[in-house]
């Protein structure tokens, strides 16, 4: 490796270790420009892309490293990890096998290959049993006959949820306590019944003295969610909330966040709204921690019922005919209309898959360049400012509001104002140092941005319940 390229690599490694990912990628890129045949440089940049969640770019760089040196085990390991991150375990198995063949004494490669093979077997088994529509996980449960544990000292959940119960539940969660299964199942059942009557695109009017608080990703950061309520008031009939997906996974209080949002939705069904994000899906939950958290804190049935409710969540919201709010972004087709979004049959499809309107609503990202481009994530696509403008003008919208990506300041107005990103998980995964933000909207439809910092939380690391295949990213 040329001396200057080596110096750039060493400096980039330092930035990466300190969590300054953008600077690290920039320096790796400069080093590659000086030495474009060095596998280590591509592999290191692949790791940086893994940390920034640009999994498609991570796969590309790992593949380039393999082209430069087909015997470089770490590159296969990086590529396998990126495939796992976008739930492509079958592709990952081959790379883990190659990494282990090249480094047979590496215990990490051996362990991850075994876990990946087990995951593939599990997927195949589930595919085999799901050829026919499985019964609801709520079937054959008589919730009313379930017992409440004798040591439960909280407010009792009656037939109708109450503000007293919700406030007590929130406080108990702060103390590390769980819901009795009777109450957990009751909340999930009632929420399921409510969502079954909800369209795929919901209309949210904001009138008179009402305020709507739009929140982006919260990702299991329960104590930051409570801080949002402290700063902007809890949900109420006049203080509405819209949560724009990705409220589970990564953070280690995802069940607490989910039950809190669901309880508020039941308490104020016309004032609390929840869009589906790409992490309210089975594939992501198996890898990023929510399934593991449900199993640890409750049981497998609890996860299966959550999964059923996730498949019923609306895919988008329309605020006073002015702003479309979706988790990911816009579409591969310029001619998509709001009526098409309303008519999506989310009840039969359930999971977003790899193509189609549902997938694009959950996965796509904006790009600075005009037109459309491949996704840096490896799923979906990227859309430019001209795409945003055409969509808004064709559908009579002021802008599209989306989430799905960290922003250093918690939000970003993009595409000449036609695309706005809001992200509400400050210091995401305890590592990025970003601010969180929410958007407040009143009847005049002016957007009011509010930023906030992370608050302390108990000493449980992010991804504590995640699949071990992602460790070391």
From Swiss-Prot:
Its EC number is 3.1.3.16. One of its GO terms (molecular function) is protein serine/threonine phosphatase activity. It comes from the Eukaryota. Pfam families: Metallophos, PPP5, TPR_8. Mn(2+) 1 binds at residues 217, 219, 246. Keywords: Hydrolase, Manganese, Metal-binding, Nucleus, Repeat, TPR repeat. It comes from Schizosaccharomyces pombe (strain 972 / ATCC 24843) (Fission yeast). The keyword Transferase does not apply. Protein phosphatase that specifically binds to and dephosphorylates the molecular chaperone Hsp90. Dephosphorylation positively regulates the Hsp90 chaperone machinery. The TPR repeats mediate protein-protein interactions with substrate proteins, but also autoinhibit PPT1 phosphatase activity. The TPR repeats mediate protein-protein interactions with substrate proteins, but also autoinhibit PPT phosphatase activity. It catalyses: O-phospho-L-seryl-[protein] + H2O = L-seryl-[protein] + phosphate; O-phospho-L-threonyl-[protein] + H2O = L-threonyl-[protein] + phosphate. Mn(2+) 2 binds at residues 246, 278, 327, 404. This is Serine/threonine-protein phosphatase T. Belongs to the PPP phosphatase family. PP-5 (PP-T) subfamily. GO terms for biological process: signal transduction. Its cofactor is Mg(2+); Mn(2+). The active site is at 279 (proton donor/acceptor). It is found in: Nucleus. It is an enzyme of class 3 (hydrolase). Binds 2 Mg(2+) or Mn(2+) cations per subunit. PROSITE patterns: SER_THR_PHOSPHATASE, TPR, TPR_REGION.
């Amino acid at each position: 490796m040329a001396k200057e390229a080596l110096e750039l690599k060493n400096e980039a490694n330092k930035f990466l270790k300190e969590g300054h990912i953008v600077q690290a990628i920039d320096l790796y890129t400069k080093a590659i420009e000086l030495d474009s045949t060095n596998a280590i440089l591509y592999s290191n940049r692949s790791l940086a892309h893994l940390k920034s969640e640009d999994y498609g770019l991570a796969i590309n760089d790992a593949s380039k490293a393999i082209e430069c040196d087909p015997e470089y085990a770490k590159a296969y390991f990086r590529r396998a990890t990126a495939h796992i991150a976008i739930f492509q375990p079958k592709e990952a198995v081959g790379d883990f096998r190659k990494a282990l063949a090249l480094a047979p004494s590496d215990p990490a490669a051996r362990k991850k290959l075994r876990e990946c093979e087990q995951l593939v077997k599990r997927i195949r088994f589930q595919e085999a049993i799901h050829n026919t529509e499985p019964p609801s996980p709520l079937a054959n449960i008589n919730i009313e006959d379930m017992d409440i544990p004798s040591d439960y000292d909280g407010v009792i959940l009656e037939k109708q949820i109450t503000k007293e119960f919700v406030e007590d539940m929130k406080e108990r969660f702060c103390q590390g306590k769980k819901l009795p299964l009777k109450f957990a199942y009751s909340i999930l059942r009632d929420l399921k019944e409510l969502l079954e009557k909800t369209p795929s695109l919901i209309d949210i009017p904001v009138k008179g003295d009402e305020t709507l608080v739009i929140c982006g990703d919260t990702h299991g950061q329960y104590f930051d969610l409570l801080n949002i309520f402290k700063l902007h008031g809890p949900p109420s009939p006049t203080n509405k909330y819209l949560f724009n997906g990705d409220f589970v996974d990564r953070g280690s209080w995802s069940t607490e966040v989910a039950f809190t949002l669901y309880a508020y939705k039941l308490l104020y069904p016309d004032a609390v709204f929840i869009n589906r994000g790409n992490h309210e899906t089975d594939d992501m939950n198996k890898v990023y921690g929510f399934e593991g958290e449900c199993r640890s804190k409750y049981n497998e049935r609890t996860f299966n019922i959550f999964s059923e409710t996730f498949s019923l969540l609306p895919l988008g919201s329309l605020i006073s005919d002015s702003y479309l709010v979706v988790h990911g972004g816009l579409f591969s087709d310029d001619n998509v209309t709001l009526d098409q979004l309303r008519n999506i049959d989310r009840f039969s499809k359930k999971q977003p898959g790899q193509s189609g309107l549902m997938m694009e609503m959950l996965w796509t990202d904006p790009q600075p360049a005009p037109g459309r481009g491949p996704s840096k994530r490896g799923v979906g696509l990227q859309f430019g400012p001209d795409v945003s403008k055409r969509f808004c003008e064709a559908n009579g919208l002021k802008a599209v509001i989306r989430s799905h990506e960290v922003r250093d300041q918690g939000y970003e107005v993009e595409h000449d104002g036609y695309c706005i990103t809001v992200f509400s998980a400050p210091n995401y995964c305890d590592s990025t140092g970003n601010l969180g933000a929410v958007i407040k909207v009143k009847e005049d439809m002016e957007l009011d941005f509010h930023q906030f910092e992370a608050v302390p939380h108990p000493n449980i690391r992010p991804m504590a319940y995640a699949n071990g295949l992602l460790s070391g990213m």
